[in-house]
């Protein structure tokens, strides 16, 4: 049980780092347009100050509160950590990543960022330690409606896209691609991550059982 928990937390933190790095890459490739949620956070940053990461935390806290009220359950510790750490990691990567000077570089970096976002979400959600604010809402809607997770994700992304556009956020062709492709990638990354985690847990459990007892 202890070994399984360690593996789950490893997947969780690895997923958060992958996700945050992907977000920062899409921001660096903003010549194409920023991903919907980050365009929304970026527009808030433009209007009211603070940082993109700080607005990610604030909006996440509001969503966690709404989801908790709807389900009448306290959020998992993983959801709370996600709410804070994603914002911190985004600001960290935004600080250390060099600015791009070419359009070709923006395309490459943005494309890689979209893939990492989709897989980052799949990896940390597979740990079962509490999805982040936005993904908790996604899973709640999926559970209550029975709709495909890809379409739920796309619907949320498109809704936020229009909100960001209305606030003058950096919307472009890349924003539309992110809204569509993230849900598609998640459809594959989530079951793949669950399968990989279960395999790692089974291997670790078998290794522990096979090891000689300590006297």
UniProtKB/Swiss-Prot annotation:
Which top-level group of life is the source organism from?
A: Bacteria
Looking at the UniProt entry, the stretches that span the membrane are: 9-29, 50-70, 77-97, 107-127, 160-180
- Provide one Gene Ontology cellular component: plasma membrane
The record ties this protein, via InterPro entries, to: YczE/YyaS-like
Topology relative to the lipid bilayer, per the entry, is: Multi-pass membrane protein
Keyword vocabulary terms for this entry: Cell membrane, Membrane, Transmembrane, Transmembrane helix
* Location in the cell: Cell membrane
Protein name as it appears in the record: Uncharacterized membrane protein YczE
Species the sequence originates in: Bacillus subtilis (strain 168)
What gene name is given for the protein in this entry?
yczE
